[in-house]
Design a protein with these regions (language model features):
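Conserved short histidine dyad/triad with adjacent acidic residue
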Residues: 81-95, 176-181
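Single conserved hydrophobic/aromatic residue that forms the stacking wall/gate
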Residues: 1-11
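Short, glycine/charge-rich beta-strand/loop segments that flank catalytic centers
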Residues: 20-29, 76-85
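Non-heme Fe(II)/2-oxoglutarate
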Residues: 17-26, 171, 177-257
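Short, conserved beta-strand element in jelly-roll/cupin
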Residues: 67, 93, 100-118, 165-167, ...
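Double-stranded beta-helix
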Residues: 116-183
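Signature of the catalytic double-stranded beta-helix
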Residues: 33-77, 100, 113
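Short, structured patches in soluble enzyme cores that scaffold and shape functional sites
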Residues: 78, 83, 94, 111-115, ...
Length: 257
């Protein structure tokens, strides 16, 4: 039921974009209302109650509790469309540098809304990379790129990547330190993936990127933490988004204005 309803909303959202800038949506440069090229619906839980019902009461919460412990917070959500016939790549990156926390007990759960096969550019994960280094996502000119540099990629075993395909309803899980990405979608079919990030209650956000969200930092299982937990490993800080407008990962990685 959840997947069927989310897929219906996904199709509707793809035709709701018109002229002008709507910050709910991240659009490919070639997007037209009659020929939509949507990269992402930002924070779908803020716009459709069904998404929040799934994120706060559905199987994601059970999985998050199993992996993070009894006290779980919701952080943010997004719906990546990965449009067919060339939907843009997502270069290799780690998530936590975009929204650092006091520790690394933060993960992202995803669910495919359509069947996804290997030709549709499924998300790829480098196994074990969550135990490796945290990479710098700035370039040599100190510009935030949102992706791991070519030099640093030589430190990774990219050939070991596991690409997560499966039928509609397949769930993906990756820790906030996992190196992941996806190729351009050269198939004729879109590959919508609904993603929700959760943290242990004791992992506190250091930056305020998602604090404007209606449900950001909502306890979805257990209770709020009385003590924060700090990891001894450092975390990279992103630019001050309050002074420099935050662009989507696609805009950063493709160096779009």
């Amino acid at each position: 039921r959840y997947i069927r309803r989310q897929r219906q909303m996904c199709i509707r959202d793809s035709y709701e974009t018109g002229p002008g800038k709507d910050r709910r949506f991240d659009l490919e440069p070639s997007h037209q209302p009659g020929a939509p090229r949507i990269r992402r619906l930002n924070s779908p839980v803020d716009h459709h109650r069904e998404y929040w019902d799934f994120a706060s009461e559905g199987p994601f919460v059970e999985i998050a509790e199993d992996l993070l412990g009894p006290d779980v917070k919701f952080h943010h959500s997004k719906l990546n469309f990965k449009w067919g016939d060339g939907g843009e790549e997502v270069k290799w990156h780690q998530d936590i540098q975009f929204w650092p926390h006091t520790n690394y007990e933060v993960l992202t759960l995803g669910v495919y809304l359509d069947d996804v096969d290997p030709t549709m550019a499924p998300m790829g994960i480098i196994p074990g990379s969550h135990n490796g280094p945290l990479f710098d996502l700035y370039d040599e000119s100190d510009t935030w790129t949102g992706n791991i540099s070519e030099n640093d990629l030589t430190l990774l075993e990219l050939d070991s990547a596991e690409y997560l395909s499966g039928p509609a309803g397949t769930v993906t899980v990756h820790n906030c330190r996992c190196v992941h990405g996806s190729a351009p979608n050269l198939s004729s079919r879109s590959r919508p993936l609904f993603l929700c990030a959760y943290s242990a209650a004791h992992a506190l956000p250091i930056t305020d990127l998602t604090r404007g969200g209606k449900y950001s930092e909502t306890i979805v299982r257990g209770k709020a933490a009385r003590w924060a937990k700090f990891d001894s490993r450092p975390v990279l800080l992103p630019p001050d988004w309050s002074k420099t407008r935050h662009k989507s990962i696609f805009e950063h990685q493709q160096n779009e204005n």
